[in-house]
Regions:
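Short, well-structured beta-strand/strand-turn elements
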Residues: 34, 306-320, 381-384
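Glycine-rich beta-alpha junction loops
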Residues: 41, 126-128, 199-204, 241-243, ...
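Active-site Gly/Thr loop motif
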Residues: 219-234, 295
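Conserved Rossmann-fold dehydrogenase catalytic segment
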Residues: 156-164, 187-203, 222-229, 270-273
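Aromatic-enriched alpha-helical interface/lid elements that frame and gate functional surfaces
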Residues: 232-308, 312, 388
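Terminal low-complexity tails and localization/encapsulation signals of metabolic enzymes
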Residues: 1-10, 222, 238-239, 320-388
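N-terminal helix-loop segment corresponding to the beta1-alpha1 unit
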Residues: 1-188, 362, 366, 370-388
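Oxidoreductase and adenylate-handling cofactor-binding alpha/beta cores
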Residues: 172-192, 205-217, 258-265
Length: 388
């Protein structure tokens, strides 16, 4: 089998919490060597819980596989020297401190660039390096300031956050794309560059059609529950037993839906002839659909609608979602190759490469688990450079 696509790249991971670690875990899955630098107390998320497994936070375990951990106190001169040695030998450095923090230790991009011109240096912040550099930022704050909460929830009077730190995850993915792009360019020029990612810009980009409605049409979107601002029926609906999701994107699908529900005439109703009309008349549309859906349970409607190609599905909880993915043969849970049956149980990467698949080599590291080995390894690298 061919080596992993990012082997043997070395990533100096100075990141913490979620956005940075999600990025570096993705790079590690693709074969990069990840050295995670932690302060003496460890990554903040090591203490975030419950739940815990064997006294380890599942939050931390979920985004730190395929990494080695070294504890460094950057206020200590020797530890700072080790950190700088790591940065000078790395192909990639990822950090998500508030802008200016790395510069206080001489670990900022300009300081490292002189001795490592090929370094791809990635900085992730909440609000960017300019006017927002002093603003503290967690995902929730960005969801609020970035507009996501205003379009999420039952109505505009009940702003609601997403059920996961979605902006952090998206920032990690955008950082990964930026890093891979910079590495590709480095193959041509031999030069590294600075990749800057901020959560605010990530969210505005990820709002996609909602952002476009404001930028292009000067319309300010609002929350409409589980519905879609531009498509109907595209929502959750009550049935005789349980809820069902309908995602009807075409007039043909709407006609099929009405046929299956036994209300074929609804498709010819002047209020519902086109998607635009259905969006304008979503309230009476819901009333008619739920009246028909009440005749049977959600399981029945999902089965018969799916059979004719109308997008429909149950509203699963997380356990049901994993079970469904397993039924589809997607292997949603993997075990790391180190044989740790508890801490090594991992959510599968969604990246599937035919020739160079992702790997699940090791569980998330214990705090400082590899400190001695990494120090010795870096000392040898440094000695080799000085004698070269």
């Amino acid at each position: 089998m061919a080596p992993p696509p990012l082997s043997p790249l070395l990533v100096a991971d100075f990141s913490h919490v979620l956005a940075g670690p999600f990025c570096t875990m993705t790079l590690g899955d693709l074969g990069a060597e990840i050295v995670k630098v932690e302060r003496p107390a460890g990554d903040d998320t090591r203490a975030w819980g419950p739940p815990f497994v064997d006294n380890e936070s599942t939050y931390f375990l979920g985004v730190n596989r395929n990494k080695r951990s070294i504890v460094l106190d950057l206020h200590d001169a020797e530890d700072l020297r080790v950190a700088r040695t790591l940065a000078e030998h790395a192909d990639v450095l990822v950090e998500n401190f508030r802008p200016g923090i790395m510069a206080q230790f001489g670990l900022d991009e300009p300081s490292i660039r002189g001795t490592n011109p090929a370094l791809v240096y990635c900085s992730i912040s909440a609000f960017g390096p300019a006017a927002g550099r002093q603003l503290a930022g967690y995902d929730l704050l960005v969801q609020a300031l970035g507009g996501l909460m205003s379009i999420t929830g039952p109505d505009s009077d009940t702003p609601t956050k997403a059920g996961v730190a979605l902006v952090d995850v998206l920032a990690g993915l955008f950082a990964t794309v930026g890093i891979l792009s910079a590495l590709h360019e480095r193959d041509r020029s031999g030069r590294g560059q600075h990749v800057e990612i901020n959560l605010m810009s990530v969210l505005l980009s990820a709002l996609a059609n909602q952002s476009a409605s404001y930028v292009l049409a000067e319309q300010i979107p609002r929350a409409i529950g589980n519905g879609h601002v531009s498509i109907a029926p595209y929502d959750t609906y009550a049935t005789g037993e349980g809820m069902i999701v309908l995602a009807v994107g075409t007039d043909k699908q709407f006609g099929q839906l009405c046929d299956i529900l036994g209300i074929s005439g609804l498709a010819q109703d002047g209020r519902f002839l086109t998607n635009e009309l259905r969006v304008l008349n979503r309230a009476p549309l819901r009333k008619n659909l739920e009246r028909a859906l009440a005749a049977r349970p959600a399981e029945y409607w999902t089965r018969v609608l799916t059979a004719v190609g109308v997008p429909a599905g149950a509203v699963n909880n997380i356990a049901e979602a994993f079970a469904f993915a397993a039924q589809l043969g997607l292997q949603p849970i993997r075990n790391t190759e180190d044989g740790d049956s508890r801490l090594g149980r991992q959510v599968a990467s969604p990246i599937n490469l035919s020739a160079t698949p992702v790997s699940y080599r090791t569980r998330a590291p214990l705090l400082g688990e590899h400190s001695c080995d990494i120090r010795s390894w870096l000392a040898k690298l440094d000695a080799g450079r000085k004698t070269a």
